[in-house]
């Protein structure tokens, strides 16, 4: 076991500073949000328990009577956020495993057994996960008072309400570390460590058009029967609506990956610059890596496109909206934008992590282009196109698609909601593009090694 610890220490020391900081941040941010999301669910649950014992707890027209509805919304938001949180933790582990063939080969050549070599890599990832969990827990604790700026059910969210407790803090920290270990182990399964060297197994991923075809069929069916279903009654209409929306959720990943693959092929064929051609080919070669960066943002954007104009239209309905209804509608809007903002923050860091992985994985390509005389900023411009174009199309497009999907249930109006949703999408795209600039130090380090090799 001492050999494994020594090997893990050697791997830690071989890390560059930029990758180490990014790996810790990729563990810390999702852990902080995981604790905050858990605290929010617990806060609404505690409020519902108190409301159930109040005099108006059985009155569905009062805020106390709607407390259980808020709990349901909190669980729904938590479900939406848990996917990008887990994905980011896994991506942080993959960042630790990228381009480690040389380090692993050195450990193998000095006599460390293949199993112990892999265990050392897993241990190294767990060390970064522990540091990330500690930093994330501190970030969560420090930001607790800031939640008081948000008001739900007519009163602010208190720091004491958002505190999850020591037990939940320890359990979720352990869960994040176990997720890192599992992700690292799965990544190591793709690495072959033999006496002759170290190599990664790779499989060419296929992109199927089945998902987009099903999505188009579902959208056409909904636009055809949606209005009719709503005329049959609220219960029947909502059941049909939720059924169609659930079916679209099941195939959203297939649609997203296929769309990015198609977009990449179009960019490569229609390109008028070498940067655009390289960006398009990289997107077409690995559309799943691009989708992982902001797929969750596109999904939540679809929901914002559905719900925000709808609630805005309801709030403009006139005399039927009493004070309680206005509070509930305002809380729904606020909750959706909060969920979207958290997803954007996760998506931005996820973009930085996944782009760093792609930089490390394409190090040989960067070196080859540099030897051929490519300008220093060539790959940076290509990378910006690779991030900005699909981010804009997928995030803004998903919101617009959500608004189209909701059109059978909406009357005229909702213009304010449309503008707010669209502005949020544009801000999200800008944030993701800015986050991708975190890969610049890595690329400069690779180019510096090329210049040293020439000298």
Stretches found by the model and what they are:
Residues 1-83, 323, 327:
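Membrane transport/envelope proteins' first extracytoplasmic loop
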Residues 2-7, 18-19, 23, 204-214, ...:
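Hydrophobic multi-pass inner-membrane translocation pores used for secretion
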Residues 12-32, 115-131, 168-169, 240, ...:
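Alpha-helical transmembrane segments and their helix-start/interface "positive-inside/aromatic belt" motifs
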Residues 36-42, 87-93, 129-154, 170-190, ...:
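Small-residue-rich transmembrane alpha-helices
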Residues 51-61, 147-164, 320-325, 405-420:
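Short juxtamembrane loops and helix-capping segments at transmembrane helix boundaries
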Residues 75-92, 342-349:
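Long, hydrophobic alpha-helical segments
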Residues 89-110, 355-367:
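Transmembrane helix boundary and interhelical loop/hinge segments in multi-pass membrane proteins
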């Amino acid at each position: 076991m001492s050999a494994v610890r020594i090997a893990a220490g050697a791997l830690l020391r071989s890390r560059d500073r930029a990758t180490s900081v990014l790996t810790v941040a990729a563990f810390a941010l999702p852990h902080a949000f995981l604790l905050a999301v858990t605290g929010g669910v617990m806060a609404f649950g505690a409020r519902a328990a108190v409301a159930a014992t109040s005099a108006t707890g059985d009155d569905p027209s009062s805020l106390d009577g709607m407390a259980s509805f808020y709990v349901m919304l909190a669980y729904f938001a938590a479900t939406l956020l848990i996917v990008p949180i887990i994905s980011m933790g896994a991506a942080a582990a993959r960042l630790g495993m990228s381009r480690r063939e040389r380090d692993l080969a050195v450990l193998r050549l000095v006599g460390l057994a293949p199993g112990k070599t892999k265990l050392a890599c897993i241990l190294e990832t767990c060390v970064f996960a522990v540091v990330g969990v500690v930093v994330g827990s501190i970030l969560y604790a420090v930001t607790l008072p800031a939640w008081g700026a948000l008001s739900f059910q007519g009163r602010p969210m208190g720091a004491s309400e958002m505190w999850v407790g020591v037990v939940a803090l320890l359990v979720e920290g352990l869960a994040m570390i176990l997720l890192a270990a599992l992700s690292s182990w799965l990544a190591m399964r793709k690495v072959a460590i033999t006496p002759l060297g170290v190599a990664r197994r790779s499989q060419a991923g296929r992109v199927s058009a089945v998902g987009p075809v099903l999505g188009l069929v579902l959208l056409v069916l909904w636009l055809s029967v949606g209005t009719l279903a709503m005329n049959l009654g609220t219960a029947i209409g909502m059941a049909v609506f939720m059924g169609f929306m659930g079916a679209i959720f099941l195939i959203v990943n297939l649609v997203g990956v296929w769309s990015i693959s198609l977009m990449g092929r179009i960019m490569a064929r229609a390109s008028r610059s070498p940067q655009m051609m390289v960006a398009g080919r990289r997107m077409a070669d690995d559309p799943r890596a691009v989708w992982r960066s902001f797929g969750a943002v596109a999904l939540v954007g679809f929901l914002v496109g559905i719900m925000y104009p709808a609630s805005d239209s309801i709030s403009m309905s006139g005399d039927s909206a009493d004070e309680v209804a206005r509070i509930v509608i305002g809380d729904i809007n606020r909750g959706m934008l909060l969920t979207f903002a958290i997803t954007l923050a996760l998506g931005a860091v996820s973009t930085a992590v996944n782009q760093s992985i792609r930089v490390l994985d394409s190090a040989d390509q960067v070196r080859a282009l540099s030897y051929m005389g490519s300008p220093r900023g060539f790959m940076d411009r290509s990378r910006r196109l690779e991030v900005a174009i699909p981010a804009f199309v997928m995030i803004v497009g998903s919101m617009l698609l959500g608004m189209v999907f909701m059109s059978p249930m909406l009357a005229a109006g909702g213009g304010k909601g449309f503008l707010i949703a669209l502005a949020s999408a544009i801000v999200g795209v800008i944030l993701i593009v800015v986050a991708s600039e975190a890969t610049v130090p890595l690329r400069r380090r690779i180019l510096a090694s090329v210049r040293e090799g020439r000298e």
